[in-house]
UniProtKB/Swiss-Prot annotation:
Keywords tagged on the record: Cytoplasm, Gluconeogenesis, Glycolysis, Isomerase
SS bonds (residue pairs): none
InterPro entries for this protein: Aldolase_TIM, TIM_sf, TrioseP_Isoase_bac/euk, Triosephosphate_isomerase, Triosephosphate_isomerase_AS
Organism whose genome encodes this protein: Mycobacterium avium (strain 104)
Name listed for the protein in its UniProt record: Triosephosphate isomerase
Gene Ontology BP terms: gluconeogenesis; glyceraldehyde-3-phosphate biosynthetic process; glycerol catabolic process; glycolytic process
Length: 261
């Protein structure tokens, strides 16, 4: 099955709503509409930017989509500081990241919570980008594939085969995030292939073949081509490079198969 590449820009805790508008405008200007037939492009701003991004995307009829970096497992109630999937859906979000390593590390989120958040996203017709990945000591011990398979199972626990078919998986080796280090294309392919095999056992081979598996970890315009050329890598969850409109547009154009804009 042919899977359309997805390039997702995770802005993390960067850019106020004025800066968000400027960046989306720059991406839209740098990446002509013709590329969107071959690649899906989404930006993932902070919560406080979403309304401004929605207004711009809708008003200018831009073809890129947008989403959020997290959501609550709850729909509403006395959960101070939380943001529900219902709120994100009302803002027109398409995607939402769950289980990013920074959430797992700094907020002690475990696989059970990630699975609950993924279910909450699907309930509100949002596509969860479910993140998994190993720390350096796990890779150096040679346990990276087993670790990621276990994390995947835990993060999908309770989801039906049909629901699994609606998610995106992002493999993000923790040691490569924001460090400038990047897994080699063959290293990334090894884990992404194992992820797809595990998806087949959890759902079906047909569903596994339809799910997009992204690589995240210092993705940029220089390495995305080699990464996305791998059989089981369908795009990138992009961090720092997504804050540069021209580089992000170039990265998306490469994922679309070129030529450069």
């Amino acid at each position: 099955m042919s899977r359309k590449p997805l390039i997702a820009g995770n802005w993390k805790m960067n850019l106020n709503h004025f800066e968000a508008i400027a960046l989306v405008q720059k991406i839209a200007f740098a990446l002509p509409d013709k590329y969107y037939d071959k690649v899906d492009v989404t930006v993932l701003p902070p919560f406080t930017d979403l309304r401004s991004v929605q207004t711009l995307v809708d008003g200018d009829k831009l073809r890129l989509s947008y989403g959020a970096q997290d959501l609550s497992q709850h729909d509403s109630g006395a959960y101070t500081g939380d943001i529900s999937g219902a709120f994100l859906a009302k803002l027109g979000c398409t995607f939402v990241v769950v289980g990013h390593s920074e959430r797992r590390t700094y907020h002690n989120e475990d696989d059970a919570l990630v699975a609950a958040k993924a279910a909450a996203a699907l309930k509100h017709e949002l596509t969860p980008i479910i993140c998994i990945g190993e720390h350096l000591e796990v890779r150096e011990a040679g346990n990276h594939v087993i670790h990621c398979e276990e994390q995947l199972r835990g993060s999908l626990a309770g989801l039906s085969a049909e629901q699994i078919g609606k998610v995106v998986i992002a493999y993000e080796p923790v040691w490569a995030i924001g460090t400038g280090r990047v897994a080699s294309a063959s290293d990334a392919q090894e884990v992404c292939a194992a992820i797809r095999k595990e998806l087949a056992s959890l759902a079906s081979a047909q569903i596994a073949d339809s799910v997009r598996v992204l690589y995240g970890g210092s993705v940029n315009a220089k390495n995305v081509g080699e990464l996305i050329a791998q059989d089981d890598i369908d795009g990138g969850l992009v961090g720092g490079a997504s804050l540069d409109g021209e580089q992000f547009a170039t990265l998306a154009a490469i994922a679309a198969g070129g030529p450069l804009p």
